[in-house]
């Protein structure tokens, strides 16, 4: 019987359907004892075996609208949300994750992130007295809300998703959007990376470590769908990272104020 408190929710779309067979193969290899239902939310059913459930929302929606539909269909109060390119690279510590889920409930957390990204600092986080292995992100700081791997309170996640369209807007605007009730509830982050995944794709192109992971696990991948990023793309991304690191808070607030930054493309 699957855990009744949490669902693993994988967010995808038709453009990234080629990532799903490797995703689920690695997931089942490295987390064969996963106690949670594995649900996929996407546009069209990709016909990939290995998911316990597929929520096909149809064409014409956005990343956020599909997320809202999925959360309305899911009956558990929490989700462990993953993107479709979060490929497992070694075995998951199930006992550790179950302990983190219990902490979500115990501390009434909005989110418990299992990778310290953005890196916790004295400016964006606080010590969490109840558990020294955790820190608490300061609300209304850049990317205190982010789609890095973690447990989410479904009601909080749905409220934010209902107000935005793209994954990037969800993170940027959501980091500054909290109700009075949510103000007293923590956003927690582990000091170490506790979910052993790699981000296999960036800006629609394979990362070299993503391809290496597939080759090492003898998994097929379709290079006709996406290749490695060009030099110009890598240079552009490096410049953007450099600018962002100069003052993350200022850059994010300017993006929100003037509707800058990445936007979702339909079709």
Q: Can you say where each PLM-predicted feature lies in the sequence?
A:
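Short, flexible, basic/aromatic active-site loop/helix in glycosyltransferases
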Residues: 126-142
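Membrane-proximal basic amphipathic "stem/tether" segments
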Residues: 3-4, 11, 218-267
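Catalytic core and acceptor-binding pocket of nucleotide-sugar-dependent glycosyltransferases
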Residues: 144-208
């Amino acid at each position: 019987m699957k855990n009744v408190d949490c669902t693993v929710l994988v967010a995808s779309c038709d453009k990234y359907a080629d990532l799903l067979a490797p995703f689920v193969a690695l997931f089942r290899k490295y987390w064969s004892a996963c106690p949670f239902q594995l649900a996929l939310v996407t546009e069209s059913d990709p016909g990939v075996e290995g998911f316990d459930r597929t929520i096909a929302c149809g064409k014409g929606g956005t990343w956020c609208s599909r997320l809202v539909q999925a959360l309305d269909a899911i009956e558990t109060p929490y989700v462990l949300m993953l993107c479709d390119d979060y490929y497992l690279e070694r075995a998951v510590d199930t006992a550790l994750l179950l302990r983190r889920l219990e902490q979500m409930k115990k501390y009434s957390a909005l989110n418990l992130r299992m990778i310290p990204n953005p890196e916790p600092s004295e400016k964006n986080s606080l010590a969490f007295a109840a558990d020294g292995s955790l820190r608490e992100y300061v609300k209304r700081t850049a990317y205190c809300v982010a789609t890095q791997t973690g447990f989410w309170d479904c009601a909080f996640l749905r409220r934010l998703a209902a107000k935005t369209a793209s994954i990037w807007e969800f993170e940027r605007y959501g980091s500054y959007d909290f109700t009075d009730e949510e103000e007293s509830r923590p956003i927690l982050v582990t000091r170490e990376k506790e979910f052993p995944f790699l981000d296999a794709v960036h800006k629609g192109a394979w990362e070299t470590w993503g391809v290496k992971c597939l080759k090492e696990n003898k998994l097929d991948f379709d290079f006709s769908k996406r290749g490695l990023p060009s030099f110009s793309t890598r240079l552009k991304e490096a410049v953007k990272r450099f600018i962002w690191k100069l003052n993350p808070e200022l850059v994010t607030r300017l993006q929100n104020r003037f509707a800058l930054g990445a936007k979702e493309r339909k079709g």
